[in-house]
Amino acid sequence: MARYIFITGGVVSSLGKGLASAALGALLQARGYKVRLRKLDPYLNLDPGTMSPYQHGEVFVTDDGAETDLDLGHYERFTGRPATKADNITTGRIYQDILTKERRGDYLGATIQVVPHVTNAIKDFVLSGNDEYDFVLVEIGGTVGDIEGLPFFEAIRQLKNELPRDHAIYIHLTLLPYIPSAGELKTKPTQHSVKELRSIGIQPDILLCRTDREIPKEERRKLGLFCNVRESAVIEARDVDNIYAVPEAYHAAGLDDEVLAAFGIEPRVPPALASWHTINERVRNPEGDVTIAIVGKYTGMKDAYKSLIEALSHGGIANKVRVKLDWIESEVFENEDPAPFLEHVNGILVPGGFGQRGAEGKIRAAQFARERDVPYFGICFGMQMAVIEAARNLVGITEANSTEFGPTKEPLVGLMTEWLRGNELERRSQSGDLGGTMRLGAYPAMLKRGSRVSEVYGGATEISERHRHRYEVNTAYKDRLEQHGLKFSGLSPDGVLPEIVEYADHPWFIGVQFHPELKSRPFEPHPLFASFIQAAVVQSRLV
């Protein structure tokens, strides 16, 4: 039977519960255990799909088409286990399911209440589908004391009593701030956070304390005494130079040993951390640097591009170089020459996005890369802008545009109205809902034999990648674009939807309709990112 580890947070938000959960999952996995990670999000949205990137950050898409929290990206990258829609749930989804059952009459006239109906739904979600796993790590979003989180805390409180003895523990991630004027770490915020947790019936078994320095023995003793945990269970979560150093740092601090001890488990074997050590050696001791410009719309909120940042880092690890990112708001050069902003970089990446704001700047970035032979990687919206640039400046279709921006005589990019998902036809309309109505999840693509992208994928002629988009390049313009050098080297199996474009006579210019960053791992960098950074390395030696 699976054992459960519930991870909560206190004092402040954004302490890194998702990263801590992923790192602990990786440590348990490195000891030979089968691990599953799940996220409970207390907000009322059904999913983050329609939330602003400035508020929520990236929307991470799973193979089965779920739009989920970015923490699931950490889970995948650290454990290699693909997440599914069954690994993330929100208050909104729970309420929707309960109200649907109530309308059907499933509750036989009962009064629907937070306890027991909402808490039971949360417990059912947490316990479902875990038979094949040794450990299930469950992260509760938000911080202790948030009103919207109370049903989730109540549910995990009940679960510990309902599960067999020694089958559930609580880890509380907290902050130990250093006050320079006092010259010491302060434990009071953590004490009050644990007091709040205990007031709702949850006694943490382990304290994971975020800090920028070593925790003195006296402070450990104080935390153990006032928070009612063993001194050995006060774990130091020291700041590290890169996120892939976290598993080794947490192991050195004794987190995985303390977790096993809390369950009464004798460690099988020491964790196999050699691969993590290799990654960190490459990150800390690169053989060179490359600079990549990210020309985007949400550059003020780096979390909006979380998987992208990590995938570029993985490309650097594969090539033993440090990837420096130059964030450029695409509006900056909508009406001026992009050269002063881009002539120093070794590669240009235009990521996914929505809406007209900044689009012309992205088109100019694609033109600069094409004309100057700078490696260009266009992802989703970035591919569409590269196609519009080619249509305008190579084919001569000066009014080429996307219907996403309004009516146009030359719709190079248009709304997808139907596509196949397996054997089922899915349809969308301009007037439909925004939430959950995109082409979402993993779809196959057929690669042109002998194309550069086929070579990047090791000679493959069929791939599967994750999508999140409503608009698609119009194949009616395919022949004219190919006559001017822009090759459609990847199509959907039915040949209707363009998936990949490239210039054969360019050092490296590839646009993809999907999001390859979602499948990149530190141990297994996505081939497109590894190849893109390799091209940037070559470019850096030419400058």
Curated annotation (Swiss-Prot):
CTP binds at residues 13, 146-148, 186-191, 222. Allosterically activated by GTP, when glutamine is the substrate; GTP has no effect on the reaction when ammonia is the substrate. The allosteric effector GTP functions by stabilizing the protein conformation that binds the tetrahedral intermediate(s) formed during glutamine hydrolysis. Inhibited by the product CTP, via allosteric rather than competitive inhibition. The keyword Cytoplasm does not apply. It holds the Pfam family CTP_synth_N. GO terms for biological process: 'de novo' CTP biosynthetic process; pyrimidine nucleobase biosynthetic process. Pathway: Pyrimidine metabolism; CTP biosynthesis via de novo pathway; CTP from UDP: step 2/2. Keywords: ATP-binding, Glutamine amidotransferase, Ligase, Magnesium, Metal-binding, Nucleotide-binding, Pyrimidine biosynthesis. Homotetramer. NCBIfam families: PRK05380.1, PyrG. This is CTP synthase. It comes from Bradyrhizobium sp. (strain BTAi1 / ATCC BAA-1182).
